[in-house]
Amino acid sequence: MRNLAVHFASYDVKARIFVLQIGIADDHEFPTYQKDDGFYQELCDRVKEYFDETGEDPKDWRYGVMRMIPVFALYAISYCLVQGLIPASWPVRVAAAVVFGVCQVLPLLHVMHDASHTAIGHSESGYKFWGQLTLDWMAGASMLSWHHQHTIGHHVYTNVYGADPDLPAGGEPRRFVERQKWASIYQWQWLYMPVLYGLLAIKVRFDDVLFVWLQGMDGPIRVNYYDSPLFRVFAVKGGWITYRILLPLMMWGVPFKTWLALFIISELMSGYWLAWNFEVSHISEHTFFPTMHKAAKDGELPISWAKAQVLTGVEYGHQNKLTTFMCGALNYQIVHHLFPSISQYHYPALAPIVMEVCEKHNVPFRVEPSFAAAFKAHLKHLYNMGRKGQAASL
């Protein structure tokens, strides 16, 4: 049994949902948090006041869609250049492959991410459309997998080892938390992991078939299917394979070596763009990794959910609008985790409010000056976790 009651407020800032207790669970599949001590309630009240005063729609879909129109256009143009449909020199095609890799990711960081949190408009069909268009059809991945890994898993159990699907399990080449058993290879992870991050885009397309569809698991999270596995595997994957692999090779006559080189460039670019943005926000020398105590029945984690969201995140580059656009507002990670159902385009306005309440309640709120500073803190954490002789914390 998973306790998700704490998240009603984060998806209903204006408190339209009334939670009715119908019983008390004897045990839980995953750890539970301490009850809110008034910190999150005050945050919600202040954010509600902001929207009441400004009259802004917390889920206004226009912000994201308008920003993505030029990105979609650039996506199509760079695709045509890469495949030779628009004649161009080799350097131009290589540059187009880089641009295509970024444009494959930007819609995911903007409209897909908001759609997965019901933060783009007020229509369920709209959430499905934007999510499946950008993640399933354009990127060849799985919205079902993302819902379980990210929305149900990571956002609920952020940085909780054994519960957060974003943290490594045993036998992986990365050591992020002290509870993982140390191995000699980890002393070099601060060098090789930033390179391996480029494989993320390719990896997730295999993972959502091998684990989500075949094993019914997304990391430690059990999968509840809400549509046809056969449709997702054969239609979506087939569509992506057709336009990314079969058409260039079989219809447009792109030489295999040329296609392979450009394909690898674009996919590595997508992987790096995703992974580097994801990792710096939570895997850092400045973030908190809650430790759960398996024997406890209630309040296994020594902190409330809202305070955990602040302590497990790092923000950066608040003053840089380009950074905010290029990372899909992931540089406002703490604000996003506290209010995932609010459109990311409101985060710059909400951040000062959140920081003020955090200061009042003595909850540390970490902001780095730039992405470079956040990335340096990530590398420092990789280095520290790889040091020889660090015992696993049980």
Regions found by a protein language model. Give the residues of each.
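Active-site rim elements
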Residues: 2, 181-182, 250, 259-263, ...
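Membrane-embedded catalytic scaffold of the fatty acid hydroxylase/desaturase
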Residues: 99-226, 289, 293-389
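Short, charged cytosolic
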Residues: 27-49, 199-216
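C-terminal regulatory/interaction regions
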Residues: 391-394
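Alpha-helical bilayer-embedded segments of polytopic membrane proteins, i.e.
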Residues: 59-108, 135-139, 187-202, 225-277
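C-terminal, active-site-flanking charged/polar segments
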Residues: 265-279, 283-284, 354-364
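Histidine-anchored, small-residue-rich loop motif
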Residues: 1-42, 72, 76
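Membrane-interface, cytosolic juxtamembrane amphipathic helix immediately N-terminal to a transmembrane helix
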Residues: 44-66
